[in-house]
UniProtKB/Swiss-Prot annotation:
Protein name, as recorded: ESX-3 secretion-associated protein EspG3
Source organism of the structure: Mycobacterium tuberculosis (strain ATCC 25618 / H37Rv)
Keyword Cytoplasm: yes
Keyword entries, A-Z: Chaperone, Cytoplasm
Annotated localization: Cytoplasm
Length: 295
């Protein structure tokens, strides 16, 4: 049996210590994993504590060597070739606070595999003081769909007619809602289709969880991220996808559509194509095929 793990759960202190020990660099900002002490005098006790914990977990050898698989995953997360930043927000609790989950899908290109052959990607998800690293083979945008929905409420796709709004109009609507304008009045102002009104109202007035996704790449030593991101929103009326596109005049437009797995895969493909390195999965493009429809 292959004893190489494909996932590990660490404290954020464990993760920071491993990254420093192996020289992996810093973690992406989205994970918010930073130096756990502010006084150099605290370092000795911190290092001893981490070594004890990782040794008990079987991740640190008596010679002080970090488990090679875990070390490789952390290197991928700290210095990916391509990535998706994930910021999840859950329904507000009784005290008004929202549950927050942070994550990143980190991909390596070139050979297509990490050195321990567990996959070409690593998914890191942080919840409070714990962070989970999972090695995965990701070679198709459709493989990303269940990953992106992991922190959501797993609602079925909402049923409504797709519609689009200029991003600036949506931003203006948000401002009006925050200033106290009734939701119904704002929905009228936006001219939202009748079939979509209950869904839009559930987004703003009911319990919801959502993930905001931004893509990035490292090409020729330069880090680039997309100007805009896409969102997947789970509401009492179902799952809604909010995806960006650029109009002919250069203005960004947000399209609201039922959050089907296919639609999400297409949106991921479109978002990542905005980056300098183009299509992430050129051999696995997903698109609507109207060729078999009768005229």
């Amino acid at each position: 049996m292959d004893a190489t793990p494909n996932a590990v759960e660490l404290t954020v202190d464990n993760a920071w210590f491993i990254a420093e020990t192996i020289g992996a660099g810093t973690f992406p900002w989205v994970l918010a994993i930073t130096m756990p002490y502010s006084d150099a005098a605290q370092r000795g006790a911190f290092v001893d504590r981490q070594r004890d914990e990782l040794t008990r977990m079987g991740l640190l050898s008596p010679q002080g060597v970090i488990n090679p698989a875990v070390a490789d995953w952390i290197k991928v997360v700290c210095f990916p070739d391509r990535w998706l930043d994930l910021r999840y927000v859950g329904p507000a609790s009784a005290d008004g606070a929202c549950e927050l989950l942070r994550g990143i899908v980190a991909l390596r290109t070139g050979t297509g595999k990490t050195s321990n052959k567990t996959g070409n990607g690593v998914v890191a998800l942080r919840n409070a003081q714990l962070v989970t690293f999972t090695a995965m083979d990701i070679d198709d945008p459709r493989a990303l769909v269940p990953i992106l929905g992991v922190g959501l409420a797993h609602r079925p796709p909402a049923r409504f007619d797709e519609f689009s709004l200029p991003t600036r109009v949506g931003a203006r609507a948000d401002e009006r809602l925050r200033s106290g304008v009734p939701l119904g009045e704002v929905v009228d102002y936006l001219g939202i289709p009748a079939s979509a009104r209950p869904v839009v109202e559930s987004v703003f007035s009911g319990p919801r969880s959502y993930v905001e996704i931004v893509a990035g790449c490292n090409r020729d030593g330069r880090h680039t991220t997309t100007e805009v991101g896409l969102s997947i929103v789970d509401t009492s009326a179902g799952r809604v996808l909010v995806s960006p596109s650029r109009a002919f005049d250069g203005e960004w437009v947000s399209t609201f559509s039922p959050g089907t797995p296919f639609a999400i895969a297409v949106a991921i493909q479109t978002l990542t194509a905005c980056l300098p390195d183009g299509q992430w999965f050129p051999g696995q493009r997903v698109s609507r095929d109207f060729s078999t429809q009768s005229s």
